[in-house]
Amino acid sequence: MVYDILCEIDGEIVGSCNLLRKKQIKMRHRATVGITVKQKYWSLGIGTAMFREMITLARAWGIEQLELEYIEGNERGIRLYEKMGFRTVAERPRAIRLKDGTYLSEFIMIRDL
C-alpha cells in the first residue's frame, strides 16, 4: 500500500511525502517514508507538516515502525528526521558511488509509533 501527500503552492507542486507499507505479512507493521521539498521552499515548515500528516496516517493504518534512508551530508534532512523522532540505527558504508568515484555512506533511521 502506498500513500502520497503533495504540497502545492500557486499551482506548483513544491513537496511530496510518501508512505510505503511493507507487503510481507511478517513486516506489515513497518513502512518506509520518503520526503522531498524544492529548495526554494525550505524552512517554511512544509516537511514538518507533511511528516506529521504521514505519521497520523501510519498510526491509523496500524503501522508500528517507520523507516527511512539518507545519504551522508544531508544535514537539513537529518535535522528534520530527528525533530520528527527518528534515530539512526545502521550505516551502509560506500553505498553510493558518485560520478567522480567518491563513495558516500547511506544511513537507516527508524521511528517507533
Predicted stretch roles:
Residues 51, 58-69:
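Conserved GNAT acetyl-CoA-binding A-motif
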Residues 103-113:
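Terminal substrate-recognition subdomain of acyl/acetyltransferases
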Residues 49, 53, 57, 79-83:
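Structural preference for long, well-ordered alpha-helical segments within the folded cores
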Residues 47, 51, 74-77, 94-99:
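Short glycine/proline-centered loop/turn elements that form peptide/ligand docking sites
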Residues 67-70, 82, 87-102:
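Conserved catalytic-core motifs of GNAT/GCN5-like acyltransferases
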Residues 1-40, 51-52, 112-113:
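Acetyl-CoA-dependent GNAT
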